[in-house]
Amino acid sequence: MNNTVLVTCGATVSFPRLVETVLDRSVTEKLKVLGYGRIVIQYGRGFSDTFLQLVEKHLGLFTEKKSCGIKVLDKIENLKVISVDGIEICGFEFSHDIEKLIANNIDLVISHAGTGSILDSLRVGKKLIVVVNDTLMDNHQQLIADKFEQQKLLWSVHANTEELLRALDRSENEELLKIDNTYNKQFEKLLYNVAID
């Protein structure tokens, strides 16, 4: 169980349903079965206390640790490192080094459907499950996620355990297409098509 999954909720709007869905015992058990021993959760500003409450609510009592052993994370102020039920969970509000974290330490990304977060993962070629926040005023996240999924660049789901469990199975059995991380016409066209649809 050496693999690491990153859950990113974005920096501006918290996404409690995404955090709760990932912390559901059926999801953490599935991640362990798939070889993930660490879950890193970027939960957004002002969510630290709620994060710890959600861990206890869904997974029970936990032990806090001082470090998670990932340099880019251990530098983060107020990093929460928890050991519970055979899995390590690292939680933090925000990092300017998220793309570096993804590139060097992450095997799978479960992200909100913000364009910046999607692009951070696609640039470095990581498997990506996108969770649409359907509580937002318009459906721009759904439109973005659907377009990228049509291009076979990610798997798109809503914040519920059944859909996430299916996407985790897909991440083990299907291959996504990769995009070149340098500037190119194909990527420019993809972004243009996502933006105008």
Swiss-Prot record:
It comes from Kluyveromyces lactis (strain ATCC 8585 / CBS 2359 / DSM 70799 / NBRC 1267 / NRRL Y-1140 / WM37). PANTHER family: UDP-N-ACETYLGLUCOSAMINE TRANSFERASE SUBUNIT ALG13. This is UDP-N-acetylglucosamine transferase subunit ALG13. It catalyses: an N-acetyl-alpha-D-glucosaminyl-diphospho-di-trans,poly-cis-dolichol + UDP-N-acetyl-alpha-D-glucosamine = an N,N'-diacetylchitobiosyl-diphospho-di-trans,poly-cis-dolichol + UDP + H(+). Signal peptide: none annotated. Heterodimer with ALG14 to form a functional enzyme. Belongs to the glycosyltransferase 28 family. The gene is ALG13. GO terms for cellular component: UDP-N-acetylglucosamine transferase complex. The lineage of its organism: Eukaryota, Fungi, Dikarya, Ascomycota, Saccharomycotina. Involved in protein N-glycosylation. Essential for the second step of the dolichol-linked oligosaccharide pathway.
